[in-house]
């Protein structure tokens, strides 16, 4: 199984050397770093569901990158057995809440290993996905239409409400 983590363009891409900005993006709370389970990274539908769950943790619709992490590869490269702290995701995509967990990073060494690992992974575009705002808007529209995301969970958030309205103008009313 792989695990997805949101990363920023400014924090990671276009840098020859790993720097403090990249490392600081892997900040923890109680030594735990939020990640999402990806059961089949070759299945774009599965990966997109994780991306939508991650997007629906945010208060606004915005682009992001999502890197795919392999704990077995981390173990092999760094002799670090990643520990997990299960926790439901704080997402409005209720069906995906259980697909969230945390990596436990007890030391700066572990944070550093993970940072170096991500820095190396993103050299290959197959190890990350990019989602622009319009793709995310369309994904949430489709999820609402399919009944995977409930209108009640997002209707009071102005940014998401506006995004759905934009998609309805293009793809038709959802009659919510």
PLM features per residue range, with description:
Residues 37:
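Short HxH-centered metal-ligating active-site micro-motif
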């Amino acid at each position: 199984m792989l695990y997805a983590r949101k990363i920023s363009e400014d924090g990671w891409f276009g840098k020859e050397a790993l720097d403090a900005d990249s490392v600081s993006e892997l900040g923890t709370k109680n030594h735990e770093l939020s990640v999402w389970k990806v059961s089949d990274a070759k299945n774009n539908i599965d990966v997109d569901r994780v991306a939508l769950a991650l997007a629906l943790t945010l208060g606004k619709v915005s682009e992001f990158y999502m890197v795919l992490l392999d704990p077995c590869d981390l173990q092999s490269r760094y002799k670090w057995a990643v520990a997990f702290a299960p926790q439901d995701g704080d997402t409005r995509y209720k069906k995906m809440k259980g697909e969230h967990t945390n990596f436990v990073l007890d030391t700066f060494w572990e944070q550093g290993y993970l940072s170096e690992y991500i820095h190396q992974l993103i050299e290959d575009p197959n190890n990350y996905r990019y989602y622009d705002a319009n793709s995310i808007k369309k994904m949430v529209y489709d999820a609402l239409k399919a009944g995977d995301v409930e209108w009640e969970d997002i209707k009071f958030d102005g940014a998401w409400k506006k995004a759905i309205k934009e998609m309805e103008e293009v793809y038709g009313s959802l009659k919510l």
